[in-house]
Amino acid sequence: REAKEWDKAIATYQTLLTVEPGKFGDWYWAIADCYERSGRLKEAIRSYQQSDKYPSVYFAMASCHRRLKQYKEALVLYHQARADQSTAAQASIHIAYTYEQSGGRENAIKWFQQTCKLYPKTSHASQAHAHLQTKYKISVTLGGANENK
């Protein structure tokens, strides 16, 4: 994989699926990563779907969907990732960025604010706060209050 010989790496991981099936989640993740790095995003999504690395797989698939401009699919996956408390803040800010990328300014602002309000002590809230100030000129305290400038 390091030499960027993606097809050879994929073939090796596919062989490992039969040789060591107990690690199928790792092998499918590696196959998906090769597809993603080589720009074959639809194939990457299909391989990520075979992996068992949740909730990380939601973020990986959503990233591919965003690169394909399939924003609704990405949003569904980020909302699924929000169900896991350990990744909820990260998923929330990704929802905001996805709306922003798709041209949904109002929803983007709403989700950046939600990230600040729901997860005030996280780095994602700090990032959302800074983004609201710099891009949208909205001042939001990490406690959730806001003031338009």
PLM features per residue range, with description:
Residues 109-149:
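Terminal, low-structured helical/coil segments at or just beyond the last alpha-helical repeat
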